[in-house]
Structure formats: structure tokens, C-alpha cells
Curated annotation (Swiss-Prot):
Keyword vocabulary terms for this entry: 4Fe-4S, Chlorophyll, Chloroplast, Chromophore, Electron transport, Iron, Iron-sulfur, Magnesium, Membrane, Metal-binding, Oxidoreductase, Photosynthesis, Photosystem I, Plastid, Thylakoid, Transmembrane, Transmembrane helix, Transport
Any one GO BP annotation for this protein: photosynthesis
Highest taxon of the lineage: Eukaryota
Main location: plastid
HAMAP family in alphabetical order: PSI_PsaB (MF_00482)
Name listed for the protein in its UniProt record: Photosystem I P700 chlorophyll a apoprotein A2
Transmembrane segments: 46-69, 135-158, 175-199, 273-291, 330-353, 369-395, 417-439, 517-535, 575-596, 643-665, 707-727
Subcellular location: Plastid, Chloroplast thylakoid membrane
Subunit structure: The PsaA/B heterodimer binds the P700 chlorophyll special pair and subsequent electron acceptors. PSI consists of a core antenna complex that captures photons, and an electron transfer chain that converts photonic excitation into a charge separation. The eukaryotic PSI reaction center is composed of at least 11 subunits.
Species this protein is from: Amborella trichopoda
Membrane association type: Multi-pass membrane protein
GO molecular function, one term: magnesium ion binding
Length: 734
């Protein structure tokens, strides 16, 4: 018999039903479960696949550069970043009639094009790229890196180049390498690029390899570095009248602490950014020399953890046993990595708009909205993944004997308290927030809007005031003009910060009121509920009150009938599945809030948000309905415009989303009946019955149907909102 898919599981390969295909796809990446896998092989496979991942990333970014250089308008955009629309790539579509061709021919292009809302143009411009040739050079370099990564991946699968398990479990060496070698050196290299290429570029000086050694980034060269007069590098910064990309109003400083924004570009000062990266480089280069490797000096992580037992004994054996537990569990490590990355990605979303780092990106409203939404959704998926792998850790890798009475075991011991507290918080937030919204709706519906319950967020306003926002009149800390912190700030640190925070033209510490108070608590409800489901799923992964023996059932067991007391909806996978809906729900509220707040701000009528966001009909009517009106007129009986493709995607997104429910609101028997009916009809239909298949068609399992439903729900949800967001923003602001 020929080798059938999947080769990694002989048991599945011999399955006579279509289950073979679906289970094969589902477990293709679950290396641990494959036939003949060893711990060593597992680590080596994952390690080699990382290089493949890098190759894909480099190829993708190379493609971005290449297509903009080939089909974009980078050089004309550079001449006038505020009025030329950046082109991502051309559209070649044989289905476009003349009206569509005309509608999508924009940005000075000769034919239909896609406009770029990625912020790449602004980034490339800020870091010193100016010509298409620069973009082609970057694309070729990344293509070269992609090839190198593929070769490295292949190489590390060859017997001579496969690292041993001990190499993978050498935590100190890995930490030193990542901290110093990756973060430290790359931050230092980036500082070098900013100082030698980007900052001169922002002052009208074109530095490339041919003149790299002739142009001094700072008039004094390296002198101040060696004589300890580092403050000379901060002297003579760019003036407030500096025109970015020219020498007009330019200074000579390279490392500054100005604070605030460049008045023309509305982005952080490049010299501040360079200073930040230099500081980061220093911190990480030091951090990468802290752990004990070759010379017997420095910290041992195991010793650190073992010694870390708080006095008083209230935390039991604290961190004893944790080192081996983490170091021997890939899922624990992946969970930690995903949790960290998820938080960082969400922080990127928050900081990209409030402290825009790239020149002119703050004035490109659609890009701001797209980047915020993009990073928040990605953060949501990554964070739910962290808990999924936390649950798999408990099932596959957790050993109670090794972790007796340490912090991990104690988390499991008091999981009931954790779940009940999260449950209480979610219920409290949900009922009170909904109660306030509904009350306000009733008051408006009954014609007594003055009876709404409107709560000022005074604590949040006080925090904003403490950071320097004066409009609330709190007169505290940095908003107190005669306080020592305020006066020191004038000269000592970030003098531009207080000006920026009190200007109304940016998104720093937006003015907040009762509408913000309510939506803040709605988002808090979503966050707490998502967390409750995820934490419960992980803590109950090995066993719960109803089913104390889940270990051998694994991560994603389906319903097993009523015989065992019912196993429906109690696998760790079920918790992850439910949590993704809540995560999408929450990020929906987050992005609705951000977008509505900002479009009213950008249009100069923040009172619309302030007045309409205190009741549910306001959100539905004045945000969703009002802002989709332009979008759904992208095509109509009178013709088509440049929003038509987004209008079509809006419709298509709803369709995909709704398809999800067909898979979610059904059960296994339904699918089996459907498939038997289809197979019966097929076998009795002339011509069609000439086509046979080897595998007997069996129904999707409950878990599979839910996965298909979840995938459609998620993809449709994101397609729908992406189309709405981009079309409603670009339709208003061009």
C-alpha cells in the first residue's frame, strides 16, 4: 500500500474515513503527537521551522518594498506627503468596467491602484529612504536575507548541524544571546542608522554608502563621547520652524530629550527617538551579561528562583521546582512568549497613535485607524493563544510532584477563589454598565434626556491632570504651574511634553467625559469575562469539579454523551473557543470607541461623540449607521465610486460571518445526516456517480464544526469591520 497522508501518523493513515484528512490537517503541527518523535527531534524540528518563518517574513516585507518601488508613487509622495495619496500597488482586474477603472485610478497613477493605509510610506520616509532605487535596494537585501534563512533552516535539519537537547535547554546562554545579541546589538545598530542616515536625511542631507564616511553626524564627531561631554550631542536641536527633509530650521543635535512633537510632522523628534534606542541598547547590552555561562560568574536562573522564597512562609515553597518545570515545557515557554508579545502588540496599538513616531502619519487619519485596529486584533489572538498553550502545559507537561506547594501548585489549589472573583467582577461590570446604558436609552426615548445618569470620570481626569493636562482645573503635580515638578520640567526633562499634552491637535490624553466612563466599563467587562473564560480553561485543564480526570482526554475532547455525567463544553479547547468570541467582542468595543472618538475629533465636532455615546441607540445610530451610509453607497443604480470594493467587502464580510452560525448552531447528528443524504444523492445521480472516493464520508466532529464556525465568525467579523473602518474614514478625509 502506498504511503497515504498523514505520514506522521500510521494510525490515522489507515483510517478508512474522511476523518483521516481532517485529523491529519489538525495534528500536522502537533509534533509531540507524531509517530517516532523524540524530545530531541521535537526541539530540532521547531528550531528549523523558525528559519522558515523568518524566510517568509523577509520575503513578504521584500514584496512590500518591491511593489511600491515598481507600481507605487513614493518619489512624488516624498515631495508632498500631506496631499499625495500613497499607492500600495496596482490592481489588474479584467472584471473592472470603465467606471471602476476611473474610480480607482488615483494618486497620479495611470491605472487602477490600491491606496496604502499601512504607514509604510511614512516609516520609509522617516528612516531616510527617498527614491525608488532605495526601495529596490531594500527589497533585494531582504530577498537575500530570505534565501539565507531558508538555507539556515535546511542546514539545521542536516545531521551534523542539528543542535542537541542540552543546547536548547541552556537558558542562561539563550538569555544572554537574545538580550545582548538580538535586542542590544540591533538597538545599537538602529541608533547608528538613525544618527548616520535618518537624522541627516531629515535635515536635507542624503547619506548613502558613497559618502557615509565623509558626513559627520555631529559637528564634534566622536570627541564628546571620549571626553565625557555627552551633553554636546544634545546642543542645538532642530527649531520649531524646521521643515522636515530640508535644512530650513534644522539643528545639529543627534541625541536629545525634547519631548512632544515636531510641529510640522506632528511626530516625535527623531533625535529623541535615537536617544531612546541608544538607552535601550545600553540596558540590553548590560542585561545580556548578567547570566552565568562560560566564566562561572553572573546569575544562575535556577539559583535565583530557588532562593526567591519570601519570608513568613505564606507563599509556601515559592519558586522551587519552577526552573525545571518551565525549562522542560515548550508549551509553558510558548505561553509566556505569547503573553508578552500580546501585551507588547496592544501597547504598540496604543502608542502608535498617541505618540506617533513617523513623519506625517498623524495627519493620515485612515492609516492611524487601520494601524490601531490591526494591532489590537492581532494582540487579542496572540493573548488567547497564550492561555491555550498554558492549558496544554497543564495537560501534557505539569508534574504535581515536582511543583509541590510552589506558586504554580498554589494557583491550582485556590483556583475556585480566582474564578469566583473574576466571575463577580464580570457580573458587577456587566449589570451596572448595561443598566446605565439602558436607563439612558429609556430617558431619551421618553423625552427626558436631562434625567440620564452621566458620571464624570474624575479619577481618570485627575490622573491626566497629574501628567500635565490643565483643562480640568485640578492643579495637581505637573498641571500645577507653581509646583517643583512643573518648574523642573521646563529645563530639566522633556520641555515639549507639557505643550504637547495641552494642544488639542493630537491624541495625547484626550479629554474624557461620561461617554468615555461608560465605554471604559463596557471594555472592562469584556476584558474580565475573556480573562475569566481563559483562566478557567487553563486552571481546569487537568480536572474540574464535574470531571476530575481530564488528563488522558487531552486538550480538545468533544462531547461524550451523558454516560460519563456529560463531557460537553468542559475541555480546555472549549474554553479557548468561547474566549475567542469574547475577545472579538471586546476588541470590537475597543475599536468602535477609538474610531468614533477620533473621527469626531478629526472632523472638529467632538460634541457628537460626547452627546451620543451615553446610550446604546447613540452608538448604533450615530456611529455604526451614520458611518456606514457612505460605504453602502459605494455602488448603486447610479454607478460606482472608489468605495465600491469596500462596500462589496462589507457585504461579503457579513456573509462569511453569518455562515459561521450555520456551523455553530448545529450538532454532530445534523452533519452526519447531511453528509449521508449528499452521498446517497451523489451515488444515484447519472454522470456524477462515475466519480468515486476512497474514504467513507463521515461528519465533522463537534470540535471540528465549532472550529469551522469560529473561523468563519472571526474572519467575517474582521472583514466587515475592516471595510467599514477604512471606507468610512477615507470617505470623510480623502
Amino acid at each position: 500500500m502506498a504511503l497515504r497522508f498523514p505520514r506522521f501518523s500510521q494510525g490515522l493513515a489507515q483510517d478508512p474515513t474522511t476523518r483521516r484528512i481532517w485529523f491529519g490537517i489538525a495534528t500536522a503541527h502537533d509534533f509531540e503527537s507524531h509517530d517516532d518523535i523524540t524530545e530531541e527531534g521535537l526541539y530540532q524540528n521547531i528550531f528549523a521551522s523558525h528559519f522558515g518563518q523568518l524566510a517568509i517574513i523577509f520575503l513578504w516585507t521584500s514584496g512590500n518594498l518591491f511593489h511600491v518601488a515598481w507600481q507605487g508613487n513614493f518619489e512624488s509622495w516624498v515631495q508632498d506627503p500631506l496631499h499625495v495619496r500613497p499607492i500600495a500597488h496596482a490592481i489588474w482586474d479584467p472584471h473592472f468596467g470603465q467606471p471602476a477603472v476611473e474610480a480607482f485610478t488615483r494618486g497620479g497613477a495611470l491605472g487602477p491602484v490600491n491606496i496604502a493605509y499601512s504607514g509604510l510610506y511614512q516609516w520609509w520616509y522617516t528612516i531616510g529612504l527617498r527614491t525608488n532605487e532605495d526601495l529596490y535596494t531594500g527589497a533585494l537585501f531582504l530577498l537575500f536575507l530570505s534565501a539565507i534563512s531558508l538555507i539556515a533552516g535546511w542546514l539545521h535539519l542536516q545531521p551534523k548541524w542539528k543542535p542537541s537537547v542540552s543546547w536548547f535547554k541552556n537558558a542562561e546562554s539563550r538569555l544572554n544571546h537574545h538580550l545582548s545579541g538580538l535586542f542590544g546589538v540591533s538597538s545599537l545598530a538602529w541608533t547608528g542608522h538613525l544618527v548616520h542616515v535618518a537624522i541627516p536625511g531629515s535635515r536635507g542631507e542624503y547619506v548613502r554608502w558613497n559618502n557615509f564616511l565623509d558626513v559627520l553626524p555631529s559637528p564634534q564627531g566622536l570627541g564628546p563621547l571620549f571626553t565625557g561631554q555627552w551633553n554636546l550631542y544634545a546642543q542645538n536641536p532642530d527649531s520649531s520652524g524646521h521643515l522636515f527633509g530640508t535644512s530650513q530650521g534644522a539643528g545639529t543635535a543627534i541625541l536629545t530629550l525634547l519631548g512632544g512633537f515636531h510641529p510640522q510632522t506632528q511626530s516625535l523628534w527623531l533625535t529623541d527617538i535615537a536617544h531612546h534606542h541608544l538607552a535601550i541598547a545600553f540596558v540590553f547590552l548590560v542585561a545580556g551579561h548578567m547570566y552565568r555561562t562560560n566564566f562561572g560568574i553572573g546569575h544562575s536562573i535556577k539559583d535565583l528562583l530557588e532562593a526567591h522564597t519570601p519570608p513568613g512562609g505564606r507563599l509556601g515553597r515559592a519558586h522551587k521546582g519552577l526552573y525545571d518545570t518551565i525549562n522542560n515545557s515548550i508549551h509553558f515557554q510558548l505561553g509566556l512568549a505569547l503573553a508578552s508579545l500580546g501585551v507588547i502588540t496592544s501597547l504598540v496599538a496604543q502608542h502608535m497613535y498617541s505618540l506617533p513616531p513617523y513623519a506625517f502619519i498623524a495627519q493620515d487619519f485612515t492609516t492611524q485607524a487601520a494601524l490601531y485596529t490591526h494591532h489590537q486584533y492581532i494582540a487579542g489572538f496572540i493573548m488567547t493563544g497564550a492561555f491555550a498553550h498554558g492549558a496544554i502545559f497543564f495537560i501534557r507537561d505539569y508534574n504535581p510532584e515536582q511543583n509541590e506547594d510552589n506558586v504554580l501548585a498554589r494557583m491550582l489549589d485556590h483556583k475556585e477563589a480566582i474564578k469566583s472573583h473574576l466571575s463577580w467582577a464580570s457580573l458587577f461590570l456587566g449589570f451596572h454598565t448595561l443598566g446605565l446604558y439602558v436607563h439612558n436609552d429609556v430617558m431619551l426615548a421618553f423625552g427626558t434626556p436631562e434625567k440620564q445618569i452621566l458620571i464624570e470620570p474624575i479619577f481618570a481626569q485627575w490622573i491626566q491632570s497629574a501628567h500635565g493636562k490643565t483643562s480640568y482645573g485640578f492643579d495637581v503635580l505637573l498641571s500645577s504651574t507653581n509646583g517643583p515638578a512643573f518648574n523642573a520640567g521646563r529645563s530639566l526633562w522633556l520641555p515639549g511634553w507639557l505643550n504637547a499634552i495641552n494642544e488639542n491637535g493630537n491624541s495625547l490624553f484626550l479629554t474624557i467625559g461620561p461617554g468615555d466612563f461608560l465605554v471604559h466599563h463596557a471594555i472592562a467587562l469584556g476584558l474580565h469575562t475573556t480573562t475569566l473564560i481563559l483562566v478557567k480553561g487553563a486552571l481546569d485543564a487537568r480536572g474540574s469539579k464535574f470531571m476530575p480526570d481530564k488528563k488522558d482526554f487531552g486538550y480538545s475532547f468533544p462531547c461524550d454523551g451523558p454516560g460519563r455525567g456529560g463531557t460537553c463544553d468542559i475541555s480546555a479547547w472549549d474554553a479557548f473557543y468561547l474566549a475567542v468570541f469574547w475577545m472579538l467582542n471586546t476588541i470590537g468595543w475597543v475599536t468602535f470607541y477609538w474610531h468614533w472618538k477620533h473621527i469626531t475629533l478629526w472632523q472638529g465636532n467632538p460634541s457628537q461623540f460626547n452627546e451620543s455615546s451615553t446610550y446604546l441607540m447613540g452608538w448604533l445610530r450615530d456611529y455604526l449607521w451614520l458611518n456606514s451610509s457612505q460605504l453602502i453607497n459605494g455602488y448603486n443604480p447610479f454607478g460606482t465610486n472608489s468605495l465600491s470594493v469596500w462596500a462589496w467587502m462589507f457585504l461579503f464580510g457579513h456573509l462569511v460571518w453569518a455562515t459561521g452560525f450555520m456551523f455553530l448552531i448545529s450538532w454532530r447528528g445534523y452533519w452526519q445526516e447531511l453528509i449521508e443524504t449528499l452521498a446517497w444523492a451523489h451515488e444515484r445521480t447519472p454522470l456524477a456517480n462515475l466519480i468515486r472516493w476512497r474514504d467513507k464520508p463521515v461528519a465533522l466532529s463537534i470540535v471540528q464544526a465549532r472550529l469551522v464556525g469560529l473561523a468563519h465568525f472571526s474572519v467575517g467579523y474582521i472583514f466587515t469591520y475592516a471595510a467599514f473602518l477604512i471606507a468610512s474614514t477615507s470617505g470623510k478625509f480623502g
